[in-house]
A protein has these predicted regions:
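Active-site-adjacent substrate-binding region
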Residues: 144, 149, 295-396
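Acidic/histidine-rich catalytic neighborhood of metal-dependent amide-processing enzymes
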Residues: 165, 199-202, 223-313, 327, ...
Length: 396
């Protein structure tokens, strides 16, 4: 029988290695969902598939030229196609955007406007500032939008939104610097992309219990378009599959649900589909895994909407794992959808890996089997603590 560490890293190598990028609507996303389904059925879980419509998008070629020199540029996910030669209008603040004549030109955003990626219009955490930036751009109708990437390493796109109507792409820092310094009279941009209706699916496996109450262990399996997504989040999926195999032969008093969500990296499509049928009043707690297991990272644990009793229980288990730390609550993953509905939520994540997230560097060889084992073992101890509890025990 394989050791737990070998099982965990095997799942990561399959998802982030053989399959690779798994953004919604892609063949990789479909292949990953099928792999997870097969693994859950092999373990003996009762499996439910929850499909959601989503955009299926692909990019063939991206060209940016200035003064007959070809420059690096990265098309933004879900961008419509464009081919245009036009002058460039730089803007670094909302005030500059408000006063700029952008019609038919190429807007080059930098500085305060690109200090962070702009959230999709439908994202529940979108800010008024982001909404203002989107509204100004769509009203002023530039031919395309270029965003200067703020950091040297972090692989963030300026926009990632199928509802954003303008062609857009993101510039590496050195290219943005060159364009702003030289201010060429015209630049040529060509984005060859295709967008059509597609679908993605949650894969839900269950171990039925004697009671209707449920513990949910969840992890998203989709990725951003730019990464094989080992730490974000093949490792999380590996953990829930390994825990499913461990507990499948020993049913608990409550039902245990293993939810592999898809749609997290664009919009919470997966968790929204889940909540169309899920009943918050029946869920004892949710345990989410997103970002644990990197060699250069530290495994983290936190809680949202949880009682003091649940938090004390989780922290007492954590105390036996000196390589992991308790952190302040963070909302940027699927556990927040449970917490917002009053369901106690525990979240496993990773600290110290920001620059790896969503980048081509998030590969399977960066994952530590020992750190995955650490997170899985701690989660198993917490699950054993929770499985006989009543729903009320963990509520705030």
């Amino acid at each position: 029988m394989l050791e737990l560490s070998e099982v965990l890293i095997g799942h990561v190598r399959e998802l982030a290695g053989r399959i690779g990028t798994r953004y919604i609507g892609s063949t990789g996303n479909t292949a990953a969902g099928e792999y997870i389904r097969r693994e859950m059925e092999r373990i003996g879980l009762a499996v439910e598939i929850q499909e959601s419509p989503c955009p299926a998008w692909s990019a063939r070629r991206t060209i940016l030229e200035a003064e007959e020199i070809q420059l690096r540029v990265y098309v933004d996910p879900f961008s419509p196609p464009v081919e245009v030669t036009a002058s460039m209008v730089p803007a670094c603040t909302i005030a500059e955007l408000e006063h700029a004549d952008l019609s038919g030109k190429i807007a080059l955003l930098y500085g305060d406007l690109t200090s962070a990626p702009v959230s999709p219009k439908q994202w529940f955490l979108i800010t008024e500032r982001e909404q203002q930036i989107i509204a100004l751009l769509e009203r002023k109708r530039p031919a395309a939008v270029l965003s200067a990437r703020p950091g040297v390493s972090y692989f963030g796109h300026g926009f990632c939104d199928a509802d954003f109507s303008l062609p857009s792409a993101t510039l590496p820092r050195d290219v943005a610097l060159a364009l702003l310094r030289k201010n060429p009279s015209a630049v040529h941009l060509r984005l060859e992309t295709e967008r059509r209706p597609g679908s993605t699916a949650n894969v839900i496996g269950r171990i039925p219990g004697k009671r209707a109450e449920t513990i949910v262990l969840c992890a998203h399996y989709d990725t951003a378009t730019t990464t094989p997504g080992a730490c974000d989040n093949a490792g999380g999926v590996a953990i829930i599959l390994a825990l499913a195999a461990r507990f499948a032969s020993r049913p608990a008093a409550c039902t245990i649900e293993f939810a592999a969500f898809s749609g997290h990296e664009y919009l919470p499509l997966g968790v929204d589909a889940y909540w169309k049928t899920a009943k918050a009043e029946k869920i004892i707690a949710a345990v989410n895994f997103d970002g644990a297991g990197h060699i250069l990272g530290t495994n983290t644990l936190t809680a949202m909407a949880a009682s003091d009793k649940l938090i004390r229980a989780a922290r007492s288990k954590l105390a036996a794992y000196p390589g992991a730390v308790w952190v302040e609550p963070w909302p940027e993953s699927d556990h927040s959808a449970f917490a917002m509905r009053g369901v106690p939520a525990l979240a496993f994540g990773g600290a110290g890996i920001r620059e790896i997230t969503h980048s081509p560097a998030d590969t399977a060889d960066g994952i530590s089997p020992l750190k995955l084992n650490e997170a899985a073992s701690l989660a198993a101890e917490i699950l054993l603590e929770l499985k006989d509890k009543k729903v009320e025990w963990g509520r705030e």
